[in-house]
Amino acid sequence: YVPKLEEERIVIYSTMDRADLAEHRLEAICAAMIESWGYSELTHQIRRFYSWLLQQQPFASIAQEGKAPYIASMALRKLYMDRAVDEEELRVFTEMMVALDDEFECDSYEVHHQANDTIDTGGNSKKDVKPEQGSIQPSSNKGKEKDVNAGTSGTHTVPRIKAITAKMRMPKSKGAAVLKLDHLLEYAPQQIDISNTRATQSQFDTWYEAVRVAYDIGETEMPTVMNGLMVWCIENGTSPNINGVWVMMDGSEQVEYPLKPIVENAKPTLRQIMAHFSDVAEAYIEMRNKKEPYMPRYGLVRNLRDASLARYAFDFYEVTSRTPVRAREAHIQMKAAALKSAQSRLFGLDGGVSTQEENTERHTTEDVSPSMHTLLGVKNM
């Protein structure tokens, strides 16, 4: 005697669609095949439904990849009756699978889809259930509630509130809100991607290509040059007033590169271009400190005494929300000290303007200077 469930309950297992993945749906139908053993017609109906289901998407793609599970009748017999499969059965089974066409034909079985009748799901239960459906209902997590734990008491649920609701005051134009809250709830861009302290990606691409063309080097050689430029900028800064050449070491040999293409093509500024190297520069300083004490020149000039803050001691470091408070304070203090004595003048001396006055002053050798006369030894100031 093999204990069996009611046929109606097994049908529910095969038609239930609460799986997050399509593979889980197929596994549930195979479980229904196992439970239906002993009901020959029900097993056949489930197999027919499974065959039809594998022709639909996304299950057809899973079957083509060989990931669709299946339970053979010989496996069920081994499971329930512990009867091994002999060689003759395997031979007949193999020949049948070779001879079968894609269309599987049955003698007298019929499959009923889209039925309108309701059936009793249990012997003593009077609850009605939905009939077996031939169409596949798309699985979605939206709108579904969590299963109720039968071991708990009460039916109270904890309400969830939204961080942004439609009841708050919002900017409006002609009586309509100008914001889309659904998009705003999901819109969380990276700070560095929208920060105006670094150049945009298109500006960086333009600068990179312009420098490569100016240096007349290939795509494969350019990353090596960028390595040297980043290390040089860590030591010497990214001031717009730098000129001349920058140096990269090739072993013990110094290789010079002109700074003009680097500075002239940097838009908006060289510091905003080099901000793209901030994370790599920080990791580079940390790597150097693992081998030997290393403090960038930016920190040495500011007399930074804490070696643990060396990774923040370069002027194109990008301060983010993840920057520690102590490191942020040290970086801002170093920046303030560097800018304290700096003076920026909008206009310099205009060399295109000449004087229109005629100088009638006459001086002799006794005069102290071209702009100062003497009178009997008395100097007129």
Curated annotation (Swiss-Prot):
Residues 115-155 are annotated as: Disordered. Pfam families: Poty_coat. It is an enzyme of class 2 (transferase). GO terms for molecular function: RNA-directed RNA polymerase activity. It catalyses: RNA(n) + a ribonucleoside 5'-triphosphate = RNA(n+1) + diphosphate. The record marks 114-115 as: Cleavage. One of its GO terms (cellular component) is viral capsid. Belongs to the potyviridae genome polyprotein family. This is Genome polyprotein.
